[in-house]
């Protein structure tokens, strides 16, 4: 069988790009959130609790795509930093939930708009159609990766339950995460925060 060198180069280039984009994205996010004394991991945990309320560590691990052990260590560090607290259920002491402290709330609230501004800045280079196509393509790649980790997973069900099929994702974010009036200011052209992309 003849090897299609051009196609194999494309496959290799795409795989390298996926890895490098992921690594660079985390570096950029760390730079954005470091101004608020947070890491990307801490920001993700705090925004999840802010959006959904107190959660069990196992639920946080599932939502943030982490192992139970790594989630436990992250929570330990954030408890020591005073950002979150663990609370045992009074009726069932085996059940523990993680909630945000006042310090955590104070720290994360200004970081959320900064993160949203960063997302818009990075993706502004793509047209609306390109953004939709990229999202659909990445969903397919994610589905294959999940299937690799769990051969018993139903890929059709994974795609059906993906974020891209949630029509209220943006509305929930505006309601639960962004400060009142922020989106009106942003869409009117009043940017919040300074650019970080140009410095990387």
Each language-model region and where it sits:
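N-terminal helix-turn-helix DNA-binding core of bacterial DNA-binding proteins
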Residues: 27-67, 81, 152-154
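Short helix-coil-helix linker/hinge
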Residues: 36-42, 70, 101, 126-128
């Amino acid at each position: 069988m003849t090897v299609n060198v051009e196609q194999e180069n494309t496959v290799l280039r795409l795989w390298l790009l996926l890895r490098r984009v992921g690594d660079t994205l985390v570096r950029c996010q760390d730079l954005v959130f470091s101004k608020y004394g947070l890491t990307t991991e801490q920001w993700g945990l705090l925004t999840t609790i802010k959006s959904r309320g107190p959660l069990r560590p196992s639920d946080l691990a599932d939502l943030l795509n982490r192992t139970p052990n790594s989630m436990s260590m992250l929570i330990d560090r954030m408890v020591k930093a005073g950002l979150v607290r663990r609370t045992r259920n009074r009726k069932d002491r085996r059940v523990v939930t993680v909630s945000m402290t006042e310090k955590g709330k104070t720290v994360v609230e200004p970081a959320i708009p900064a993160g949203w501004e960063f997302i818009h800045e990075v993706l502004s280079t793509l047209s609306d159609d390109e953004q939709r196509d990229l999202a659909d393509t990445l969903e397919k790649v994610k589905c294959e990766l999940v299937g690799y980790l769990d051969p018993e997973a139903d890929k059709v069900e994974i795609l059906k339950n993906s974020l891209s099929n949630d029509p209220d994702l943006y509305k929930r974010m505006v309601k639960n995460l962004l400060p009142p009036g922020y989106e009106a200011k942003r869409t009117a052209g009043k940017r919040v925060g300074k650019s970080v992309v140009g410095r990387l």
